[in-house]
């Protein structure tokens, strides 16, 4: 199956295609500049889902040739201890990307930790400095990974986004707000829908692009979407039953898929793209930190 077949956008195939191009670029950077990008992921506590995510990130990084290290800390780690580790990594010229896996234990201030990371090494793109640059349209910054993945997948089936009507369901700092900005920079007409939005179904029916990132299982129904729409499902919700547990998205996939032009599945849609863009950010961050000026051209060649 290719990236797009039978109305389904295959995020795994899209990520593999993107990472294949990134690997070629990395080989050139190693030969020409002696650049070996390095990523450090910090995880605090024993959350099984977080450990699974971190394992997937490290495996993909190693497959690509990125030096990847995981620092696993006990739940009892203090905020001061975590800040100290981050400061050491900030000062280490051989570390190009730092990621603190969320969620963090309640006794640690997430915002403080995110903003302790050097913005140039903030591969998640969550630091206030990066968020501020994105808000003002200064794209020479770390852009959050999942929003980048959403736009990449949309463009695989809808190459020209200018003038398209788009809705984003959800207004989080991680997905909703940044993906709305990216759509706006593509000259879409964007509406952000949330818990206080009246007639949410009507807004969705009027949209040519729907991005669901609200964390409510199967919220978007068939009657919410118009024929020919492109639907990107960011949600991942655990459904438990006596027979088995499984993950579903924010979109009722089975009822929606035959009505729309394209839809991402859960799992296997946006998730692989998030990891792919984490690695893209790591390589681009390494280029910036090492003063490799053609990194903008590198980004264009990877994202073609």
UniProtKB/Swiss-Prot annotation:
Q: SUPFAM superfamilies of this UniProt entry?
A: Aminoacid dehydrogenase-like, N-terminal domain (SSF53223), NAD(P)-binding Rossmann-fold domains (SSF51735)
Record's keyword annotation contains rRNA processing: no
Pfam families in UniProt: THF_DHG_CYH, THF_DHG_CYH_C
Which chemical reaction does it catalyze? (6R)-5,10-methylene-5,6,7,8-tetrahydrofolate + NADP(+) = (6R)-5,10-methenyltetrahydrofolate + NADPH; (6R)-5,10-methenyltetrahydrofolate + H2O = (6R)-10-formyltetrahydrofolate + H(+)
Q: Does the keyword Amino-acid biosynthesis apply?
A: yes
* UniProtKB keywords: Amino-acid biosynthesis, Histidine biosynthesis, Hydrolase, Methionine biosynthesis, Multifunctional enzyme, NADP, One-carbon metabolism, Oxidoreductase, Purine biosynthesis
A single cellular component GO annotation: cytosol
- For this chain's UniProt record, which GO biological process terms are given? L-histidine biosynthetic process; methionine biosynthetic process; purine nucleotide biosynthetic process; tetrahydrofolate interconversion
Q: Which GO terms describe its molecular function?
A: methenyltetrahydrofolate cyclohydrolase activity; methylenetetrahydrofolate dehydrogenase (NADP+) activity
Q: In which pathway does it act?
A: One-carbon metabolism; tetrahydrofolate interconversion
Give the EC number(s) listed in the UniProt record: 1.5.1.5, 3.5.4.9
Q: Which residues bind NADP(+)?
A: 170-172, 195, 236
What NCBIfam families does the record tag this protein with?
PRK14186.1, PRK14188.1
Which family does the similarity line name?
Answer: Belongs to the tetrahydrofolate dehydrogenase/cyclohydrolase family.
> What is this protein for, i.e. what is its function?
Catalyzes the oxidation of 5,10-methylenetetrahydrofolate to 5,10-methenyltetrahydrofolate and then the hydrolysis of 5,10-methenyltetrahydrofolate to 10-formyltetrahydrofolate.
Subunit annotation? Homodimer.
Q: What is this protein called?
A: Bifunctional protein FolD
What taxonomic lineage is listed for the species of origin?
Bacteria, Pseudomonadati, Pseudomonadota, Alphaproteobacteria, Rickettsiales
Which gene is the coding source of this polypeptide chain? Answer: folD
């Amino acid at each position: 199956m290719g990236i797009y077949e039978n109305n389904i956008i295959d995020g795994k195939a899209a990520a593999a295609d993107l990472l294949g191009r990134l690997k070629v670029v990395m080989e050139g950077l190693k030969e020409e500049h002696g650049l070996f990008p390095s990523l450090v992921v910090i995880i605090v506590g024993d959350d099984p889902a977080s450990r699974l995510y971190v394992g997937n990130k490290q495996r993909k990084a190693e497959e690509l040739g990125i030096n990847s290290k995981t620092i696993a800390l006990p739940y009892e780690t203090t905020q001061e201890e975590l800040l100290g580790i981050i400061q050491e990594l900030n000062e280490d010229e051989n570390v190009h990307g730092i990621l603190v896996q969320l969620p963090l234990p309640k006794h640690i201030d997430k915002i403080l930790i995110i903003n302790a990371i050097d913005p140039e090494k903030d591969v998640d793109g969550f630091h206030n400095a990066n968020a501020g640059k994105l808000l003002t349209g200064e794209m020479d910054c770390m852009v959050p990974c999942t929003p980048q993945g959403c736009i990449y997948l949309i463009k695989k089936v809808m190459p020209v986004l200018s003038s398209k009507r788009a809705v984003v369901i959800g207004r989080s700092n991680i997905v909703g707000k940044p993906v709305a900005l990216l759509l706006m920079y593509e000259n879409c007409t964007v509406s952000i829908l949330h818990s206080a939005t009246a007639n949410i179904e009507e807004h969705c029916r009027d949209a040519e692009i729907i991005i669901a990132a609200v964390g409510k299982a199967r919220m978007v129904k068939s009657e919410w979407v118009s024929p020919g729409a492109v639907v990107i499902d960011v949600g991942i919700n655990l459904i438990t039953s006596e027979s088995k547990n499984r993950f579903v998205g924010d979109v009722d996939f089975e009822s929606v898929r035959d009505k729309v032009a394209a839809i991402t599945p859960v799992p296997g849609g946006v998730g692989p793209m998030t990891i792919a863009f984490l690695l893209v950010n790591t390589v681009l961050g390494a280029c910036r930190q090492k003063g490799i000026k053609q990194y903008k051209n590198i980004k264009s060649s990877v994202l073609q």
